[in-house]
Every structure is written in C-alpha cells, then in structure tokens.
C-alpha cells in the first residue's frame, strides 16, 4: 500500500463534498476530485495487477469482488434517497430506477437519470466500465512504444479539444464529465502513469529523493500542493469544456506520481499523510463519497425544521456527521458483507486464474 495515496483519497473526497456544499462557487472541488479518483483507479489497479500478473488476471472475478465492496452501499443509499423523496410525495418512474440498479445510469444522457436518487453514484457506472475493459486497455497501452504513446496522446488531446469546443455548453457536463467512453481517458492516464512509475528513471529519482534532507523534500511537497492551489485559482477563467476534465490531465498525474514516489520520505506533508488519523480517514473515503449527499439532505431538512439558517454551521454539521457515520458504515455494513461473502465463497479470494 502506498500510504500517501491512501490518505490523499480523503483529501480529494473532501474536495468533492465541499463542492456539493458550496455549489457552483466551488465546482473546481468536484471536478478535480473526480479526475483524481479516475486517474488513481487506473494507477492503483495497474500497480496491483500489472504486467507480471496480466495473463492471470480474471476480469469476472475482479469485478465480482469490487461489486461486493460497493454495490450493497449503493443500493442502501439509493433506498434512503428514495425514502426521502417519498416523504415529499415524489415517486420516480422505473425508467430512472432500473439504470441506477444496473449501474448503467451514466450511459443515458439525461440528468434525471445519471444524477438519480443518490447523485454521486453515477461515478460507479463509469468505474464498472473501466474495470470491464481494464485487462484489454492495460495490454494495449503497455505494448505501445514511448514514441507511439506520445503521438497517440497528442492526437487524442487535439481531437478532444476540437470536438469539445463544438459541444454546446449545456451538454458539456454529460459528454465530457460523465460519459464513460470519454472519462476512460482519465483511467488510461492512470495506467500510463504506472508505466512511468515502474521505469528505471523513477527508481533513480526515488533514490535521489531518499538522499535529500527532510527540509528539501518538504519544499518539493509544498510546490506540488501549490500546483493544486494555482490550478484552483485559474479554474474559473478556463472554458467549461476544458476545466471539466482535461484541465486535470497534467496536474493530477503530477500529484499521484510525486506522492507515490516519495511515499517513504521524511517530508512534512508525507509525515502528515502517513499519520494514523489520515490513514484512518483515507480508509473511509468511499463511504464518505457515497453517503454525504444523503446526509446533506437529512441535515438540511432537520435544520429547516428547527429554524437553523446559518449555511456555515449546517455545512460543518454535514461534514462531521458524514465522517462520523462513515466509520460504522464501513465496519458494520460494507466490510461485514464483504467478509461474509468471502466465507461463503461468493467471491474468489484470489482473483487470478
């Protein structure tokens, strides 16, 4: 496990949560956070089941294993969201419910469908698609030479930007932010990042960083953090078709690669990220992501009923309640179901063939 990346999950999931609490004034948080998790997924999956094990990787067993980790919580949060709707007299059509149950909602170009019930769950539909094509995509990307990779990447970026500029602004959110065949670019970047991470040049870089003083490593860490801050500052001035995804195709890989490389260094930021509290918070990042929208609805409704009008205090309560609930949800629901499934052989303990 790369401890720094594990803890960064919490940092970036909180950017997503804050974007949903603040609204359009902080769209950066949501789009940056989603890009991070898509790219990180490609990188971590490649790291875990990379070239040595490629020929023995079982897509079916792996997807089954991952579904048991997140699908029960997806159904639970959707049920809670539907119950909240029912209290308001809102009863959705089956045409909106079924795609979410089947995890294909992000393939349907309607906000009423892909943001249905527990809105953040659209992310799962994309991730499942990435898991299904991982083995093939990994093989293709790793057989390409460096020159082929550079040429193909340059052509892809040019085509993406040209076509993106032609998309009406009201369709950008779906076609460039949600649509799985487009967001697979982020996932592929994660796979390519794995190639760079496993290269001899990275080994040399890691060896050099290990000889640096903690103060020098801390300076480099703060420079990378500053890169994220700078990106946030220029974000509002960038065209929607760029800032929704492609804006992060450089900065997020830099963050992932850098912190993966210095995972065991003595820098201040690394020490913070590898601390026990941050590791614990990193372990509940998925649960935070899945429940925060439902918690937000419940807390806001309660605040309205008791006459609390301060948006700041409401946001603080939402964050604290979400984090507090995420721990028992993980321990007593997500992990418990997964462990029971392992005992009864509903999943393969070893996903390799």
Language model region names:
Residues 14-21, 104-108, 154-166, 222-235, ...:
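Aromatic-anchored segments of alpha-helical transmembrane domains
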Residues 187, 191, 215-336:
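Alpha-helical transmembrane segments of multi-pass integral membrane proteins
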Residues 2-3, 24-34, 112-126, 166-189, ...:
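Interfacial loop-to-helix transition and helix-capping segments at the boundaries
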Residues 17, 61, 96-135, 176-179, ...:
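Membrane-interface helix/loop caps of multi-pass membrane proteins
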Residues 46-53, 84-87, 136-144, 193-202, ...:
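Structural signal for the C-terminal ends of transmembrane alpha-helices
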Residues 60-61, 200-214, 268-274, 341-353:
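Membrane-interfacial, low-structure loops and terminal tails that flank and connect transmembrane helices
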Residues 9, 34, 38, 50-85, ...:
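Transmembrane alpha-helical segments and their boundary/interface "anchor" motifs
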Residues 105-161, 198, 329:
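Hydrophobic alpha-helical segments with transmembrane-like composition
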């Amino acid at each position: 496990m790369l401890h720094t990346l594990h803890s960064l999950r919490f940092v970036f999931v909180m950017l997503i949560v804050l974007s949903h609490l603040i609204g359009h004034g902080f769209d950066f948080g949501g789009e940056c956070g989603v890009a991070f998790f898509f790219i990180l997924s490609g990188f971590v999956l490649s790291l875990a089941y990379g070239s040595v094990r490629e020929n023995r990787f079982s897509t079916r067993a792996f997807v089954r294993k991952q579904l048991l980790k997140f699908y029960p919580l997806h159904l639970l949060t959707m049920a809670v969201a539907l119950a909240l709707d029912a209290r308001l007299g809102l009863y959705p059509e089956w045409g909106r419910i079924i795609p979410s149950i089947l995890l294909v909602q992000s393939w349907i170009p309607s906000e009423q469908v892909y943001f249905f019930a527990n809105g953040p769950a659209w992310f799962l539909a994309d991730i499942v698609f990435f898991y299904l094509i991982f083995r093939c995509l990994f093989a293709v990307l790793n057989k390409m030479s460096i020159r082929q990779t550079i040429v193909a990447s340059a052509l892809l970026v040019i085509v993406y930007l040209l076509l993106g500029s032609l998309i009406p602004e009201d369709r950008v959110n779906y076609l460039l932010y949600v649509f799985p065949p487009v967001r697979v670019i982020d996932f592929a970047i994660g796979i390519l990042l794995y190639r760079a991470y496993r290269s001899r040049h990275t080994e040399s870089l890691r060896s050099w960083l290990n000889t640096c003083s903690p103060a020098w490593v801390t300076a480099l860490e703060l420079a990378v953090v500053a890169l994220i801050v700078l990106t946030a500052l220029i974000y509002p001035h960038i065209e929607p078709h760029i800032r929704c995804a492609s804006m992060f195709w450089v900065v997020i890989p830099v963050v992932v690669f850098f912190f993966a490389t210095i995972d065991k260094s003595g820098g201040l930021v690394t020490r913070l990220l590898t601390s026990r509290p941050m590791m614990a918070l990193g372990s509940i990042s998925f649960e935070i992501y899945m429940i925060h929208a439902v918690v937000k609805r419940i807390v806001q409704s309660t605040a309205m009923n008791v006459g609390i009008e301060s948006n700041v205090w409401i946001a603080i309560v939402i964050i604290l309640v979400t984090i507090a609930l995420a721990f028992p949800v993980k321990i007593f629901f997500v992990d418990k179901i997964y462990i029971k499934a392992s005992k009864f052989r509903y999943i393969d303990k070893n996903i390799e063939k």
